Amino acid sequence: LLPALAKAKAKAQRINCVNNLKQLGISFRIFATDNQDRFPMAVTTNEGGVADVIADARGLGDPTMMYMIFGALSNELSTPKTVVCPSDSLRTTPKNFYELVTLRDRSGGKNAAISYFVNFTADETMPQVILAGDRNLTNSQFNPGNETAYSKMVKLDPRLLDRGRGADLGFTSSMHQNSGNVVLSDGSVQQVSGQRVREQIVNSGQEHQLLFPYYRRNMN
């Protein structure tokens, strides 16, 4: 009975995660409708986005502030619960979006309130590009299970992936049993393996610059 209950719980959590990502996809697209077909990552802070905060035209910026993307979507998202996967035991849900962007990580705000990576280069005009997904995507270069550093931007080149690079791309077992969920720029959600993520990036033909919500849990 207990294994059956655990399996049913995991299935329900995954469905909830899919619904979260569907809502995220809708929110990004509503934002784009109001901002000349641009997602928050391509809109400056003066216009209500985060482009110059995370990476400006000179290549400067602070990828550790990726949580600001969801702050920019606060008008489109009904609750900060949407950005926390129910299977993610290492993330907490703040009471509101003000707490999300103002509380310290160790107090449950900022990246500690985010379960999903975001593709900084995603655009509504590229429907097959991955927009966001479960943060436990990993390979030999980035590992969400060992958060000893702050957030970073991970670049995945479709040409290199097509030549065999990234064969170790996959999801850890911490959230959805070595698989994950992603939402594309067209708003569709897919349940995927690491291999399927690699194929999606290759087929899109676009470099993906993934921002992960890391924070240093080991800090005193």
Identify the function of each model-found stretch.
Residues 1-19:
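Amphipathic alpha-helical segments typified by the pilin-like N-terminal helix
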Residues 15-220:
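Short, well-structured segments within or immediately adjacent to enzyme catalytic domains
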